[in-house]
């Protein structure tokens, strides 16, 4: 039988805990408890405890979480917000739809926002920085906080891919005014559809988002401000609450896989691997994704084709383009380092459906392509 390893096995998300998930779905369906009910409250409490933040809110998705956070922070038309161009377009979209101007900057060798590029992009209109905690890795928050203090800037985090990742013992999403998370099905903690969350230590930010996520409604029949519809439904909240309870098992496996990749591929000089687990005591990586670089960009296409022929799925993050490269967004700038990285990088499988045998097979085929044998 030919081995087939998809980039991500969505069926495994359900099958892994089939009985528990079916019970949750049946229970909520039979009770008709669907929107802003106890399951949502429970999940918000557990999310705040998990991140060690004072407040947490469930929202429709991470994009909404970012938009609601930006608006709650008072960022508006005429303001500029700096972000890394190596991110999903949602980061820029949230800034744009708030009325502010998104300012993309370079990423660094760690694929996270480049610290020096932040300072170079600051103008009299700069209001905030939104670093993306990418692939389950956290930026150097000491340096970013130092810049925010120096220039009196707000800090909000796009932690869509990094729930549970840490920098010096502190959770992603808790360094600034707020942090937004994605619960898309492929995430470490993912629901069965779209879902998002926001954490904050600010009562003011919490109260503003609490209102604006539900049409600006304080209670039935009482609209106190302009709002939108971005509510995490009870079914998703209950599933997320269950999956949050299994978080440590998931992360343990991901870090085991990352260690196997490191041990099996670190001698392959034609590729660059992400930081290895525990290589930096200040950081705790959760490996939402495993993004590698091919040193020679001309080899990437044939490398991917070789893996595909051997039934190994890969993807190019964001379709292989940084945000500023999409013509329809009209950024009209060049970020050479990020552009070069996007021509060389790709994601290889990283999820709990993978067996040790699967990982060894992937390692074997990568080594073979670059002429290292087994």
Residue ranges of predicted features:
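Active-site phosphate-binding strand-loop segment of PLP-dependent enzymes
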Residues: 110-191, 197-199, 347
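Conserved PLP-anchoring active-site segment centered on the Schiff-base-forming lysine
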Residues: 67-122, 128-130, 306
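Phosphate-binding glycine-rich loop
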Residues: 32-80, 94-98, 103-105, 170
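Hydrophobic/aromatic ligand-binding patch that stacks against planar heteroaromatic rings
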Residues: 93-95, 147, 188, 235
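N-terminal "arm"/small-domain region of PLP-dependent enzymes with the aminotransferase-like
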Residues: 1-33, 349
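Helix C-cap/helix->beta junction micro-motif
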Residues: 98, 150-151, 310
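PLP-dependent aminotransferase class I/II
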Residues: 11, 39-46, 50-56, 116, ...
């Amino acid at each position: 039988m030919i081995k087939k390893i998809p980039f991500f096995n969505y069926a495994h998300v359900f099958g892994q805990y089939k009985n528990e998930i079916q019970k949750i779905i049946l229970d909520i369906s039979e009770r008709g408890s669907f929107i802003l009910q106890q399951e949502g409250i429970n999940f918000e409490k557990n999310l705040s405890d998990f991140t060690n933040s004072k407040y947490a809110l469930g929202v429709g998705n991470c994009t909404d979480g970012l938009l609601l956070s930006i608006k709650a922070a008072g960022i508006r038309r005429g303001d500029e917000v700096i972000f890394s161009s190596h991110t999903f377009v949602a980061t820029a979209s949230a800034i744009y739809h708030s009325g502010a101007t998104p300012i993309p900057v370079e990423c660094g060798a760690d694929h996270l926002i480049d610290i020096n590029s932040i300072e170079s992009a600051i103008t009299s209109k700069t209001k905030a920085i939104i670093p993306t905690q990418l692939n389950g890795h956290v930026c150097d928050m000491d340096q970013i906080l130092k810049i925010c203090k120096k220039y009196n800037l707000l800090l909000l985090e796009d932690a869509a891919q990094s729930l549970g990742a840490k920098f010096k013992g502190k959770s992603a999403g808790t360094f600034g005014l707020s942090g937004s998370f994605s619960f898309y099905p492929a995430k470490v903690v993912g629901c069965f559809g779209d879902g998002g969350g926001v954490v904050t230590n600010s009562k003011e930010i919490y109260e503003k988002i609490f209102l604006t996520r539900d049409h600006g409604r304080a209670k039935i029949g009482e609209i106190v401000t302009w709002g939108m519809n971005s509510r995490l439904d009870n079914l998703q909240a209950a599933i997320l609450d269950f999956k949050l309870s299994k978080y440590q098992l998931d992360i343990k496996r991901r870090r085991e896989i990352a260690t196997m990749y490191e041990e099996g591929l670190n001698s392959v000089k034609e590729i660059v691997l992400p930081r290895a687990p525990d290589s930096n005591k200040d950081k705790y990586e959760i490996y939402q994704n495993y993004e590698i670089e091919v040193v020679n960009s001309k080899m990437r296409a044939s490398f991917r084709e070789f893996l595909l022929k051997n039934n190994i799925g890969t993807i190019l993050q964001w379709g292989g383009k940084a945000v500023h490269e999409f013509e329809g967004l009209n950024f009209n700038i060049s970020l050479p380092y990020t552009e070069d990285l996007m021509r060389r990088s790709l994601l290889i499988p990283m999820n709990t459906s993978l067996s040790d045998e699967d990982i060894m097979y992937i390692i074997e085929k990568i080594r073979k392509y670059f002429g290292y044998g087994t």
